[in-house]
């Protein structure tokens, strides 16, 4: 998949943006998005941005457009094919996930639509379920736009960092810098995952006291992991190679 993306993206800017739009669209499309490795595809596209093969702002616009199309088509699929979807085998097997999504939409529709955009399994489900619940369009459209604007750069970011790291000239200093950058990325992403895990356990009143990883331990582990990631991120700012990293990063953001 990655080699196909590479060859297609290097053909022309139009093809590149078409790939970003299609990936974002399929990632957001009802049920289809569940079958795609979203973070891998978007991170790969982010790598092309960091490496200079793809422009950041056109990719962002293309990603947002594809995301909105996927969201709104999914909403109408849920609205007009509700009865068929309830009898669909895949949804029957994942009834628990469907029920949780419904519950969150009933209680906090706006927050659920925005935050659900960043969670793999719920991303292609929430717009469809919003339609199935006949959520008023005015309650769906605004958070959908916000989520679709924020989602592409967040999912591109790990790839952008990787692409910049590849672009940094080889030296003994840059070698250690790249490994530090990878470690920091892992710590921060792991910290975010642990926080979301702890939050789910807290919301659902789950505490596996028989398991080694209790809610309390996961909470402390989340704090330690996230703190280590943030402190390491602060410390790496003083590394000599960070000047080169900032220069490349600002070039990407400024589009120069």
From Swiss-Prot:
Q: Which domain of life, per UniProt?
A: Bacteria
Q: Does the keyword GTP-binding apply?
A: no
Which keywords fit this entry according to its UniProt record? Cell membrane, Membrane, Transmembrane, Transmembrane helix
Q: Matching InterPro entries, A to Z?
A: DedA-like, VTT_dom
Write down the membrane topology: Multi-pass membrane protein
Q: Which family does it belong to?
A: Belongs to the DedA family.
Protein name, UniProt field: Uncharacterized membrane protein BU139
**Organism placement in taxonomy:** Bacteria, Pseudomonadati, Pseudomonadota, Gammaproteobacteria, Enterobacterales
């Amino acid at each position: 998949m990655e080699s196909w993306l590479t060859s297609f993206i290097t053909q022309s800017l139009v093809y590149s943006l078409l790939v970003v739009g299609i990936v974002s669209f399929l990632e957001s499309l009802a049920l289809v998005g569940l079958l795609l490795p979203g973070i891998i595809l978007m991170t790969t596209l982010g790598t092309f941005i960091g490496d200079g093969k793809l422009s950041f702002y056109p990719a962002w616009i293309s990603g947002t457009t594809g995301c909105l199309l996927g969201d709104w088509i999914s909403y109408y699929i849920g609205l007009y094919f509700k009865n068929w979807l309830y009898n669909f085998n895949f949804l029957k097997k994942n009834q628990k996930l469907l029920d949780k999504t419904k519950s969150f939409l009933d209680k906090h529709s706006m927050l659920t639509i925005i935050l659900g955009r960043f969670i793999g399994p719920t991303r292609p489900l929430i717009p469809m379920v919003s339609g199935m619940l006949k959520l008023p369009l005015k309650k769906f459209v605004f958070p959908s736009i916000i989520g679709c604007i924020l989602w592409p750069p967040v999912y591109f970011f790990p790839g952008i960092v990787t692409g910049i790291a590849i672009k940094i000239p080889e030296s003994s200093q840059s070698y250690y810098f790249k490994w530090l950058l990878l470690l920091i990325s892992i710590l921060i992403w792991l910290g975010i995952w642990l926080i979301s895990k702890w939050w789910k356990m807290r919301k659902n009143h789950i505490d596996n006291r028989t398991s080694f990883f209790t809610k309390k331990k996961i909470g402390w582990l989340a704090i330690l992991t996230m703190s280590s990631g943030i402190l390491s991120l602060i410390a790496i700012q003083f590394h000599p190679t960070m000047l080169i990293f900032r220069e490349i990063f600002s070039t990407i953001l400024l589009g120069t």
